[in-house]
Design a protein with these regions (language model features):
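Active-site His/acidic residue clusters
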Residues: 83-91, 159-169, 173, 196-231, ...
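Substrate-binding rim/cap in mid-to-C-terminal beta-strand-loop elements of soluble/periplasmic
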Residues: 277-321, 388-437, 451
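Active-site regions of oxyanion-processing enzymes, predominantly non-cytosolic
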Residues: 70-76, 82-83, 178-212, 371-372
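Long, low-complexity, polar/charged, intrinsically disordered or flexibly structured peripheral segments
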Residues: 122-189, 195
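Active-site segment of extracytoplasmic enzymes that catalyze sulfate/phosphate-ester chemistry
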Residues: 1-49, 92-96, 153-163
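Secreted, luminal/periplasmic, and some membrane-associated catalytic domains
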Residues: 28-48, 56, 61, 86-88, ...
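Beta-strand elements within well-structured catalytic alpha/beta cores of enzymes
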Residues: 1, 14, 63, 185, ...
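Short, solvent-exposed turn/loop segments enriched in Gly/Ser/Thr/Pro and often Arg
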Residues: 1-13, 74-84, 206-208, 257, ...
């Protein structure tokens, strides 16, 4: 329900039930003028991982506050995807590619044992090959236009991890990454004794590999289809494990996505824009009013941050320069909506349409001075990286995602009536889960003390 169709912002929304302007998590990272650099959404100033930038309680905080005896655990390849949906309590587990091991904010004895008994390094020579069914489902060439590969893996199968510069990082963009998440989640069920008593527990899995695969090869690619096939089979296995360990009908689940994705730009007559191009165009527009200088500090989506030098200009000169930047970026190919952020601060409830979505995405303390959105068929990329496709726009393909709800008392393999077109706002997921857990929704709790 916001314009921030980005991993960190959406995971915070799923776990709190509140949009970015309330959670404070407006993107995967944002510019810190006091530090002179970007800071990740779950990164402390010293580089350690933290939930302190999340202004609101999450589901784990609701469980802790209710004192039900329930536990909360999350597992993901991504740190932000493990930490933010939980909140400030619970056990968040993610993959640290530098250590080639699982890690968490607080030490965990069983996780240390798990890393030792099931070392991820043993997989660094794995080779990802396509399943026999994959080509027929994809219906495109293995090396379709726009595919660039990801984290050192090339455009075509097979994909050998040890053929990359950093096999440990290449794990992120293969089905192996999801398999490792499932394996660790299954171990967490046993070691944390999840579902072993009458106190409802929470287990969150964020299966991030398909996101990386989409960025590198696109949603229509062999790689994407192959990953989905393998994921479907692994989910089936995991649900069977839940039946065996917890008991059929004794667990409930919601399956959804933090965001959608743009089809390959080549299919929509779109294209790709780098953040460097946006920054350069904005700086040229500022120079036309303010003269030579570095007037733009950062242009990472969804907002552009002016430099300290720009903000030190006389108010009238700064206002004119900002207007020129806005008009320059509006004429930039691939950008659909460019506005001054201050025009969207406050009174979000009175706004409608895109204006409402932009309003609930921005944070006066953390957002930049200018907000911009890519047009249909256009995606944003790092100039030194390159992507096949991406997400992070107002477009329906980014904002509308499937959701599967299996309420308490239902069994996973029972016949379903089939999909329908019922719309469930993402903000309803946290209250729904809280109700199942027998705890107050996170939004009803007092916010934690955060910077």
């Amino acid at each position: 329900p916001s314009a921030a169709t980005i991993t960190a912002a959406s995971h915070a929304l799923i776990g709190t039930g509140e949009p970015p302007y309330r959670t404070g998590i407006l993107a995967n990272e944002w510019w810190r003028r006091d530090l002179g650099r970007s800071l990740k959404a779950v990164e402390a100033e010293d580089g350690t991982m933290t939930a302190k930038w999340l202004r609101l309680p999450g589901l784990s905080d609701a469980i802790a506050a209710a004192k039900t005896g329930g536990k909360a655990v999350s597992v993901s390849l991504k740190d932000r995807a493990a930490i933010l949906p939980l909140g400030h309590a619970g056990t968040a587990i993610w993959y640290d590619a530098r250590r080639v091991a699982w890690t968490s904010i607080a030490p965990s004895a069983w996780l240390t044992e798990w890393n030792a008994s099931h070392p991820i390094a043993a997989h660094l020579h794995d080779v990802w090959t396509a399943l026999p069914e994959t080509p027929g489902l994809a219906r495109v060439a293995d090396d379709a236009p726009g595919e660039v590969g990801e984290v050192g893996l090339g455009p075509t199968f097979p994909h050998a991890l040890d053929a990359t510069r950093n096999p440990a990082s290449a794990i992120f963009a293969t089905p192996l990454g999801n398999d490792l998440v499932f394996d660790t989640a299954t171990e967490a069920i046993d070691r944390e004794q999840l579902g072993a008593d009458t106190h409802p527990d929470l287990l969150i899995l964020s299966l991030s590999a398909h996101d990386y695969i989409g960025h590198g090869w696109g949603q229509e690619s062999w790689e994407s289809w192959d990953a989905v096939l393998r994921l479907d089979r692994r989910i089936d296995q995991f649900l069977g494990d839940l039946d065996a360990k917890v008991g059929a009908g004794r667990w409930a689940m919601i399956v959804t996505s933090d965001h959608g994705a743009c089809p390959m730009p080549e299919s929509l007559h779109g294209g790709r824009i780098s953040f460097a191009q946006i920054k350069d165009a904005a700086n040229r527009a500022a120079i036309a009013e303010l003269g030579p200088g570095e007037w733009i500090a950062n242009a990472r989506y969804p907002t552009l941050y002016l430099s300290r030098a720009a903000l030190a200009q006389k108010p009238r000169d700064l206002a004119v320069a900002m207007t020129k930047i806005v008009y320059a970026l509006r004429s930039f190919p691939g950008l659909e909506r460019v506005e001054k952020s201050a025009d969207f601060w406050g009174n979000c409830e009175t706004r409608t349409g895109d204006a409402f979505l932009i309003c609930i995405t921005l944070d006066p303390e953390r957002s930049g001075e200018i907000v911009y959105m890519p047009a249909k068929g256009w995606v944003l990329e790092d100039s030194d990286e390159g992507v096949a496709t991406g997400h992070g726009s107002l477009q329906s393909y980014d904002r509308q995602v499937p959701v599967i709800v299996l309420p308490p008392g239902r069994t996973a393999h029972a016949a379903l009536t089939g999909p329908d077109d019922t719309t469930i706002p993402m903000a309803r997921i946290a209250p729904m889960l809280a109700g199942w857990l027998g705890v107050p929704p996170p939004s009803s709790l007092r916010a934690p003390a955060t910077p």
